[in-house]
């Protein structure tokens, strides 16, 4: 059993991309040069470093530090889906719902059951504000090494 689960809310609002270098992608959509990725433009297979993404004093995420998966990195996006409820969940229900839904998608991407894996789950999910103002329903599921070791290459199908 994991000691903690990271859940971060995707912030509403617009990220000032003009002040930060954006990640470059090739024709397949894979990141080839590191840079900023808007939280709403993340894709399955994107790798990124923590930076301040999962800081306790930074509960809202506008962007992440995208990095090619061939370089050492902290996280990899393995699923993105929309929450299928009509009203914003109360209390910790959004975090619980996001985690459980990400856990259901874990094995098919990683190739190993969550409970026996060396990887853990990080979730990014809507805030009440982004839910109401932007009709944000998107949840992003990412994996990271439970021992905080850097990952190299995609974890897809590697049964780590």
Language model segments and positions:
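Hydrophobic h-region of N-terminal signal peptides that target proteins for export
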Residues: 10-18
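N-terminal Sec-pathway targeting helices
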Residues: 1-8
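Primary mode marks residue(s) on the alpha4-beta5-alpha5 output face of response regulator receiver
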Residues: 3, 17-160
């Amino acid at each position: 059993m994991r000691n903690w689960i990271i859940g971060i809310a995707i912030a509403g609002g617009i990220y000032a991309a003009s002040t930060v270098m954006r990640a470059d992608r090739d024709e397949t959509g894979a990141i080839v040069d590191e840079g900023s990725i808007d939280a709403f433009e993340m894709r399955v297979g994107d790798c990124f470093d923590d930076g301040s993404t999962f800081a306790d004093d930074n509960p809202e995420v506008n962007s992440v530090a995208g990095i090619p998966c061939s370089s050492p990195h902290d996280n990899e996006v393995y699923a993105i889906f929309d929450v299928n409820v009509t009203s914003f969940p109360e209390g910790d229900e959004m975090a619980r719902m996001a985690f459980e839904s990400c856990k259901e998608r874990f094995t098919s991407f990683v190739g190993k059951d969550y409970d026996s894996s060396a990887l853990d789950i990080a979730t990014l999910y809507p805030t009440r504000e982004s839910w109401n103002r932007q009709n944000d329903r998107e949840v992003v599921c990412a994996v990271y090494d439970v021992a905080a070791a850097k990952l190299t290459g995609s974890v897809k199908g590697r049964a780590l």
